[in-house]
Amino acid sequence: MLVAAFAAAGEEVEGNPTYPILPHLGELIVGIIFAIIIYAVIAKKVVPRLEAMYEERRAAIEGNVEKAEKAQAEAQVALEQYKAQLADARGEANRIREEARQQGAQILAEMREQAQAESERITTAARATIEAERVQATAQLRAEVGRLATDLAGRIVGESLQDSARQSGVVDRFLADLERSESGASSR
């Protein structure tokens, strides 16, 4: 139906019907030539630029992907190094802690030894001082008892015991008798 409408609208030129939407042969040839020229210009100028832009974009995307993969690999290596360093640091901290604990125990043991030695030294010195004071007190007591005994014995006996040898013999005999009487009284 459409063809019939075109045929009715067209005029007949030299026995051929003309169609209004069909171009003339000259126009058709000029159109084909311009189409070929436009195609050639596009193929020579535009397409290479588009291809270059496409290639640049593809290379940039691939480069970015490679960079991202490389960065991820580096991050993984850094993470492994960090974990290794962290493990080393923990091991070092444990070693230092254990070393400090051992040093503390050693210092404590040394301090105990020093305190024990000081205690023994003080105890020994105190015992020596006490013994020296006891010996001195005993000597003073013997001398005092001897002097008193000599005075009393001299009064009782009526003779003078001023001679030191005699005095010493009397004192020793008196103390021996006194010790015997005390030991006899304590055994009862």
Curated annotation (Swiss-Prot):
GO cellular component, one term: proton-transporting ATP synthase complex
Membrane topology, from the record: Single-pass membrane protein
Domain of life of the organism encoding this protein: Bacteria
Coiled-coil segments on the chain, per record: none
GO molecular function, one term: proton-transporting ATPase activity, rotational mechanism
Transmembrane annotation, as ranges: 21-41
Alphabetized UniProt keyword annotations: ATP synthesis, Cell membrane, CF(0), Hydrogen ion transport, Ion transport, Membrane, Transmembrane, Transmembrane helix, Transport
Cell compartment(s), UniProt: Cell membrane
CDD domains: ATP-synt_Fo_b (cd06503)
InterPro entries: ATP_synth_B-like_membr_sf, ATP_synth_b/b'su_bac/chlpt, ATP_synth_F0_bsu_bac, ATP_synthase_B_chain
Subunit structure: F-type ATPases have 2 components, F(1) - the catalytic core - and F(0) - the membrane proton channel. F(1) has five subunits: alpha(3), beta(3), gamma(1), delta(1), epsilon(1). F(0) has three main subunits: a(1), b(2) and c(10-14). The alpha and beta chains form an alternating ring which encloses part of the gamma chain. F(1) is attached to F(0) by a central stalk formed by the gamma and epsilon chains, while a peripheral stalk is formed by the delta and b chains.
PANTHER family (alphabetical): ATP SYNTHASE SUBUNIT B (PTHR33445:SF1), ATP SYNTHASE SUBUNIT B', CHLOROPLASTIC (PTHR33445)
Task performed by this protein: F(1)F(0) ATP synthase produces ATP from ADP in the presence of a proton or sodium gradient. F-type ATPases consist of two structural domains, F(1) containing the extramembraneous catalytic core and F(0) containing the membrane proton channel, linked together by a central stalk and a peripheral stalk. During catalysis, ATP synthesis in the catalytic domain of F(1) is coupled via a rotary mechanism of the central stalk subunits to proton translocation.
Family of this protein: Belongs to the ATPase B chain family.
Record's protein name: ATP synthase subunit b
Organism: Kineococcus radiotolerans (strain ATCC BAA-149 / DSM 14245 / SRS30216)
